[in-house]
């Protein structure tokens, strides 16, 4: 019986940078996936990694993260906040994130990735939606569409939002796709924060990472004992907000 391995990338805002170091460590020890699954910021990292699943690709991803600023991802202004109060919608324009994706991604369709790639998004009904073909940029934008912050993205007639809402740690999907060995690249959470982040989006992202951590533990307990599951250790103590791109 063939043994398939999957890398599962979780969400977590700017803490997604931690996954770059995890990838470097895994590859240096000869651990390679047969396919990858990602949700939220994990979808972004999974998509880049699937495009170049080697040390050189990880080095490229590291350079992207090192050059990233908060304004590149969350271009929020006073005018946008006032506009939200007057006309409820979303706070940030996803244009910056789209430009980031299109400037660095070496392919345009998910099915063109060198290794199989699966992106998770959430439907309006709260169901997990798997994206494995079609425009890569749209899939990433859908999976990272944090409610209120970014607008939902229409794909195949459905308005989709952040994959972390329904399936932030999609280990069950990895198992359904045939993985018997699952390596989870979790972003962790700011376990050493003494008080919540001051900015509203920072607080929302911090709450999301706390939810992700508990969701991860719960999902592990529900998986079959026949699966070989490894969760890459996260950083703790950690006092960096998932909204901090410094």
Region locations from a protein language model:
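Patatin-like phospholipase
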Residues: 2-101, 133-141, 186, 194
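Intrinsic-disorder/low-complexity, polar/charged segments
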Residues: 14, 72, 109, 197-203, ...
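Short, solvent-exposed amphipathic alpha-helical segments in soluble enzyme
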Residues: 23, 136, 176, 198-201
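A short, N-terminal amphipathic alpha-helix
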Residues: 28-30, 42, 214-223
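Flexible, glycine-rich phosphate/dinucleotide-binding loops
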Residues: 45, 191, 238
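Short, basic, helix/turn surface patches
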Residues: 61-72, 206-220
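Active-site-adjacent alpha/beta core region of enzyme catalytic domains
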Residues: 74-188, 221-246
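Short acidic, glycine/proline-enriched helix-loop-strand junctions
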Residues: 191-215, 225-230
């Amino acid at each position: 019986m063939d043994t398939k391995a999957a890398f599962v990338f979780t969400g977590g805002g700017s803490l997604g940078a931690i996954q770059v170091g995890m990838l470097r460590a895994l590859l240096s020890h000869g651990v390679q996936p047969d396919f990858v699954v990602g949700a939220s910021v994990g979808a972004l990292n999974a998509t880049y990694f699937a495009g170049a699943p080697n040390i050189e690709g990880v080095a490229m991803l590291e350079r992207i993260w090192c050059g990233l600023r908060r304004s590149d991802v969350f271009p929020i202004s006073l005018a946008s906040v006032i506009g939200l109060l007057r006309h409820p919608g979303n706070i940030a324009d996803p244009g910056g994130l789209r430009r980031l994706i299109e400037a660095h991604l070496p392919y345009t369709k998910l099915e063109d990735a060198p290794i199989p790639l699966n992106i998770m998004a959430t439907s309006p009904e709260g169901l997990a939606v798997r994206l494995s073909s079609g425009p890569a940029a749209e899939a990433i934008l859908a999976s990272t569409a944090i409610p209120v912050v970014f607008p939902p993205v229409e794909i195949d007639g459905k308005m989709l939002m952040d994959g972390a809402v329904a399936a932030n740690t999609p280990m069950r999907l990895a198992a359904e796709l045939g993985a018997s060995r699952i390596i989870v690249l979790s972003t962790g959470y700011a376990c050493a924060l003494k008080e919540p982040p001051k900015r509203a989006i920072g607080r929302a992202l911090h709450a999301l990472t706390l939810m992700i951590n508990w969701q991860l533990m719960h999902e592990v307990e529900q998986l079959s004992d026949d699966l070989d599951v490894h969760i890459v250790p996260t950083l703790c103590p950690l006092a960096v907000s998932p909204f901090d791109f410094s």
